[in-house]
Amino acid sequence: MRLFGYARVSTSQQSLDVQIKALKAENVRATRIFTDKVSGSHVNREGLRMLRLKVEEGDVVLVKKLDRLGRDTADMIQLIKEFDDMGVAIRFLDDGISTEGTMGKMVVTILSAVAQAERLRILERTNEGRLEAKAKGVKFGRKPTVDKAEVFTLHGQGISAMEIAKRLKIGRSTVYKVLAS
């Protein structure tokens, strides 16, 4: 039996350090730790793909948390089945569960379904909040870019920089920068 590790964060700005440290504490060799810095909703992850190629029957894959392996219940079930068909067990360190045995597989399936439901609830609440804010007039996203042609046109008509700034709802310094360019 060989131990392998898998760690994932959703973005390249996040750190894998905590997960890798936990895997090493379980005696997983650094050369057997596979990582990804992409969303768990992406099924074709490079680190996961490499892990699938390396493991053999009797091996065990350690993952710090259930949601690090995947986000979607159907994808998680498919991954677990794929590893199970290869004779490879998955153990989730923080959750204290394993795919070894029928009960372990059932628990993992239920927990991944609960995790997915929670994510959907969070998305729902976020969207409701966004719609409510929008109804109250809250603006989202970047401010519109400055229409430089309009700044030059108004300036050509003899309108002051302060008045141009008011009309176009931009800073006076922005007007000066456009005129200087």
From Swiss-Prot:
Domain of life: Bacteria
UniProt-listed Gene3D superfamilies: 6.10.250.10, Homeodomain-like, Resolvase, N-terminal catalytic domain
GO biological process, one term: DNA integration
GO MF term list: DNA binding; DNA strand exchange activity
InterPro entries: Homeodomain-like_sf, Recombinase_CS, Resolv_N, Resolvase-like_N_sf, Resolvase_HTH_dom, SSR_resolvase
DNA-binding segment(s): 161-180
Family indicated by similarity: Belongs to the site-specific recombinase resolvase family.
Protein function: Site-specific recombination protein.
Protein name: Resolvase/recombinase
Source organism per UniProt: Pseudomonas putida
